[in-house]
Amino acid sequence: MQSATDIRIPDMKPCLPGFEHVSRSWDRMHGCYAAKILPGEYYVTIHDEAIVTVLGSCVSACIRDKVFGIGGMNHFMLPEDSGGGDDVLVPGGKAARYGGFAMEQMINDILKNGGLRKNLEVKIFGGGKIIRNMDTMDIGQRNIDFVRRYIETEELTLVSEDVGNVFPRKVIYFPATGRVRIKKLRNMHNTTIARRETDYRRKIVEKPVGGDVELF
């Protein structure tokens, strides 16, 4: 009888150009390689592998070509505008431009690598209310509102979502099949996740918004 330690781990296939910085490792539970993305990152693959992230108030869009199995996941949070207001739904506002860039970068990479826009399906996750006493703004809901509006405006197909509430989520996405596994995390994880997202939020306040991305 073959034991788990006797199973040969296959060689890791090369990632697409531009994603060499993303950490990838063998996931024994799922029998495939998994790419782990952090706040502000995204990953696109043409291989049968998983993409993993942990979300608090940030959101992730999982997008794939349902015919060819090419897809990716992002992980982002919207910045406030310079006046501390909420420009999430204002065309041309900093938040809308930042969020749009986060979505368009990933979609563009999917299309560049063989995906077709007409085949795209979207699943969204995150937007939990885990950062308390930061300000009066519900950061998670703001992120949810943006990504829903973006999907509607761009006429993309939203097939499922698991958003809101007060807990963080671990998301494991398999672009080749569209399958997603969600694990709701306990409160003991909140402090670490909130600290990471607070640091990320602080960085994007001053970070220039990326340039326009032309969609195929």
Predicted regions and their residues:
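Short acidic-hydrophobic catalytic motif
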Residues: 1-58, 65-68, 74-91, 95-121, ...
